[in-house]
């Protein structure tokens, strides 16, 4: 088991970039966080490893009580953030935009990484357009994978409301059905893609880590409850700093990050997790403009009737890039 002391000591010795990312001077010069107890969502997916790898970094930021709260699904997890029960999360952008459009008080702070989603299909599906009239497995309607695929379909002129049938199953069941040809495609997420490749189930139709335009936009964002951010700006910035440092850790030390995920029960298969972390560009938050990602996805979701708000309204009312811009200057390396 990797202890807190071992984790921080090893990262501090991870080379020049590691030292820069983890140096405490800036954090200690700031006021203490307004709250010392912090709750974050606990959901499946190796790609959001920064949220879990950040645990010890959050403690170093002054949060003495850090806990991860598990809900029934991703939609319920976002509802918990909106209610303030769990004030902070890292999650897929699409569902967050839908919740904001419905009036939930969520604020986007930063894009965390690109990638995550890989669409696997039978030989009858060679492109996204071939999904018309087909059945696709997803784990939950309104989840990140469902909303991402809806966006991808909108990009090629399909209407996910009528051109495809979504079949809701667990990941294991969807993989089985795809292998047996009982569904035509499965929208895989994070380490599931590594398992499907290893088991030689289906073929890749779309990989959001490498295929344009998806590879140009962040998949997962850090979001916060609006009231929490207003009342606790220091805590909000410190939490964001810990997660972005953890994203850098995932880029530089994917093996160690994967080990933390498995040891602490956030993932099961070390090899699948480490393969996922090695493939994802976790340092893109430094250079990408998160507003560009919001514009891109908001247009797609508006086209298929999933949101009513314009990209301009979403950006103006539900984003706050101040902390991100400050951290881009602070965490140079």
Predicted regions and their residues:
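Short, solvent-exposed loop/beta-turn-alpha elements that line the ligand-binding surface or hinge
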Residues: 58-63, 210-215, 282-290
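Pocket-lining segment of extracytoplasmic ligand-binding domains
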Residues: 94, 173-263
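Secondary-structure end/capping motifs
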Residues: 231-309
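N-terminal secretory signal peptides and thylakoid transit peptides that target proteins
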Residues: 1-15
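Short, glycine-/small- and polar/acidic-enriched structural segments
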Residues: 30-168, 177-180, 184-190, 201, ...
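Conserved C-terminal helix/tail region of periplasmic/extracytoplasmic solute-binding proteins
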Residues: 302-333
């Amino acid at each position: 088991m990797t202890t807190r002391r071992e984790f921080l000591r090893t990262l501090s010795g991870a080379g020049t970039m590691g030292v820069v990312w983890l140096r405490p001077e800036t954090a200690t010069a700031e006021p203490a966080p307004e709250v010392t107890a912090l709750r974050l969502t606990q959901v499946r997916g190796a790609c959001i490893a920064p949220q879990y790898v950040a645990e010890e970094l959050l403690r170093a930021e002054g949060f003495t009580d850090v806990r991860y709260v598990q809900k029934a699904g991703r939609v319920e997890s976002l509802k918990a953030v909106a209610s303030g029960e769990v004030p902070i999360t890292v999650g897929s952008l699409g569902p967050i935009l839908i919740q904001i459009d419905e009036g939930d008080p969520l604020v986007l702070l930063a894009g965390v990484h690109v990638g995550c989603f890989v669409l696997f299909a039978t030989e009858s599906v060679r492109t996204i357009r071939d999904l018309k009239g087909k059945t696709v497995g997803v784990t939950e309607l309104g989840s990140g994978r469902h909303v991402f695929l809806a966006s991808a379909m909108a990009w090629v002129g399909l209407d996910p409301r009528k051109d495809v049938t979504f079949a809701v199953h667990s990941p294991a069941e969807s993989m089985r059905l795809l292998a047996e040809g009982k569904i035509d495609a499965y929208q895989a997420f994070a380490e599931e893609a590594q398992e499907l490749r290893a088991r030689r189930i289906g073929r890749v139709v779309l990989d959001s880590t490498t295929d344009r335009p998806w590879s140009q936009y962040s998949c997962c964002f850090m979001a916060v409850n609006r009231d929490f951010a207003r009342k606790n700006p220091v805590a909000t910035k410190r939490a964001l700093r810990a997660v972005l440092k953890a994203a850098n850790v995932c880029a530089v030390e994917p093996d160690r990050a994967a080990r933390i995920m498995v040891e602490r029960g956030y993932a099961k298969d070390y090899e699948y997790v480490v393969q996922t972390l090695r493939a994802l560009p976790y340092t893109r938050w430094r250079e990408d403009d998160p507003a560009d990602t919001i514009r891109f996805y908001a247009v797609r979701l508006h086209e298929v009737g999933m949101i009513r708000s314009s990209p301009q309204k979403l950006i103006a009312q539900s984003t706050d890039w101040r902390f991100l811009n400050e951290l881009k200057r602070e965490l140079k390396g």
